[in-house]
């Protein structure tokens, strides 16, 4: 329905979130129930920070992984007992290290990412708390002070994935690639309930790739 008019089509291809696309259909035209989705294991969501610094950041490359705390404990907080991790692993990207157009001369653009379980509570207070956690460790591990050099900061988390992308539970990567959610065991590309309706994206075949 566009501008209060129906649009006819020979084929419909949905690139939106698979679960969301099905909720736009009458229940009898959906392939998968809410229980089906609830029982699936999803790959992580993420808390991202987009940060501008008024100086060049030292001792980092374009891509940097900060795995200085227990990997298994963080993984358990994503997959086993979903909760905010006490001490999060995080990834940092500084695109201005390799692309001078990413930041003004003498300044730096940074992106910080914390993997999280999908469906977690997401508040500004939690975002602020976790930025403080990782930026303090970042300063310690890279042997420099940067907090007072922040001139821009925005965050993106579970609620934003839901609001902007209709992402199921705010996931960032689709279903986890477990044995029973791989290849032909994933949601089907072609609807069995609606003629010539097809799906694409991270929740169907082939999925988002190996890491999640």
Which residues are covered by each model-predicted region?
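Glycine-rich phosphate/pyrophosphate-binding beta-alpha loops
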Residues: 46-48, 186, 202-212
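Short glycine/proline-enriched loop/turn "hinge" motifs that connect secondary-structure elements
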Residues: 100-107, 188-192
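Mid-domain catalytic core of redox enzymes
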Residues: 2-103
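Hydrophobic, well-ordered secondary-structure elements that form the walls
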Residues: 13, 51, 112, 138, ...
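A glycine-rich dinucleotide-binding beta-alpha-beta segment and adjacent secondary-structure elements
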Residues: 91, 144-205
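Flavin-binding catalytic cores
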Residues: 56, 85, 124-163
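Conserved FAD/dinucleotide-binding core of flavoprotein oxidoreductases
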Residues: 19-25, 54, 104-137
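Glycine- and acidic
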Residues: 46, 115-124, 198-204
């Amino acid at each position: 329905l566009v501008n209060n008019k129906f649009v006819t089509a020979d084929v419909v291809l949905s690139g939106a979130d698979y679960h969301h696309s099905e909720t736009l259909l009458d229940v009898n035209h959906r392939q998968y129930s809410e229980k089906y989705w609830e029982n699936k294991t999803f790959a992580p969501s993420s808390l991202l920070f987009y940060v501008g610094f008024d100086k060049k950041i030292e001792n980092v490359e374009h891509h940097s992984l900060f795995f200085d705390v227990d990997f298994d404990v963080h993984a358990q907080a994503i997959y086993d007992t979903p909760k905010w991790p006490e001490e999060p692993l995080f990834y940092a990207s500084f695109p201005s290290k390799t692309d001078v157009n990413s930041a003004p001369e003498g300044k730096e653009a940074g992106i910080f990412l914390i993997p999280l379980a999908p469906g977690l509570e997401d508040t500004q207070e939690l975002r602020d708390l976790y930025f403080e956690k990782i930026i303090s460790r970042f300063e310690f591990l890279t042997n420099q002070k940067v907090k007072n050099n922040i001139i821009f900061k925005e965050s993106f988390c579970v609620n934003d994935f839901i609001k902007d992308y209709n992402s199921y539970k705010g996931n960032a990567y689709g279903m986890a690639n477990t044995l029973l959610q791989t290849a032909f065991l994933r949601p089907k590309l072609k609807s069995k309930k609606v003629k010539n309706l097809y799906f694409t994206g991270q929740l169907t075949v082939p999925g988002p790739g190996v890491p999640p």
